[in-house]
Amino acid sequence: MGVSYIPIARVGELAPGTMKEIDLGGRQVLLAFVEGKYFAFSRNCPHEEADLKAAGQLLDGTKIRCNNHSYCYDLQSGECTLPKGAAPLTVLPAEERGAEICIRLEW
């Protein structure tokens, strides 16, 4: 199994509690900086494909709420926490590597 790291931003580029949109070869993802950690996830809410850049609200802790229908997701696991059992949010492992924030891909 191999691992690749794709740089998507620089450390310090995002203020706490903010998000940035990233284009990964045509796939739109968001990068959030919450509680000192970076989280990368799908830009679209899995419920009805709402744009989380426009409709998403970062909550205390590592949660995001889609304000279109109040679905809430855990940014660490992607689990839908409200309502329980709904389709999960796609999350990608993001980590600091030196001065860069990278998405880790395993293949």
Give the ranges of each region predicted by the language model.
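Rieske [2Fe-2S] iron-sulfur-binding domain
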Residues: 19-107
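Zn-dependent metallo-beta-lactamase
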Residues: 1-23
